[in-house]
């Protein structure tokens, strides 16, 4: 009986660690896909890493420090972003100070993504606002699936400033006349868009022709 009890405990432990590892794997892959779609230089080799390869590299209990990602923008070398995976504990203001000091000591970045597994305190959120660059917060559960790949989601394309200007001129309208898209929309957060940026949204239906609309982030 004692032996069986031990076997159950061990099995449960292995299962729990496997789930944890798989969660990190999925979230990191989605994050790299997200960076690539934003124009950052991320290799296909990193994105296509299998779960087995991920386990071989990082183990069943990955060290979050080793999961960090840094990438430069393909078309603007002055833009560099870092991704930091926070641990399972509550993120307090002291943790934010440590992250800030560590990131800034390593590299000169223009953006930071924090992947959270637990609650972040109000004081820590206030500390985030003091950073000199844009900081984005994502729950790890929001990154287990790539929202841009959902079969029911229409195709989204981010317009650059020139394309936006041409659009407004073509239809003789002002930015405020465009349909709005909330800054909290998952696809807006995925692309890291700012207020005023415009997305081209293409809807496709098997029974009808594709329909295109433009929406402005508010």
Swiss-Prot record:
Localization of this protein: Nucleus
Pfam families found in the cross-reference section: RNA_pol_Rpb5_C, RNA_pol_Rpb5_N
Record-linked InterPro entries: Arch_Rpo5/euc_Rpb5, RNA_pol_Rpb5_N, RNA_pol_Rpb5_N_sf, RNA_pol_subH/Rpb5_C, RPB5-like_sf
Transcription found in the keyword field: yes
TM helices/strands, residue ranges: none
GO cellular component assignments: RNA polymerase IV complex; RNA polymerase V complex
GO biological process: DNA-templated transcription
GO terms, molecular function: DNA binding; DNA-directed RNA polymerase activity
Tissues showing expression: Expressed inleaves, flower buds, flowers and siliques.
Superkingdom of the source species: Eukaryota
PANTHER family associated with the record: DNA-DIRECTED RNA POLYMERASES I, II, AND III SUBUNIT RPABC1, DNA-DIRECTED RNA POLYMERASES IV AND V SUBUNIT 5B
Similarity remark: Belongs to the archaeal Rpo5/eukaryotic RPB5 RNA polymerase subunit family.
Subunit structure: Component of the RNA polymerase IV and V complexes. Interacts with NRPD1.
Name of this chain's protein: DNA-directed RNA polymerases IV and V subunit 5B
GN (gene name): NRPD5B
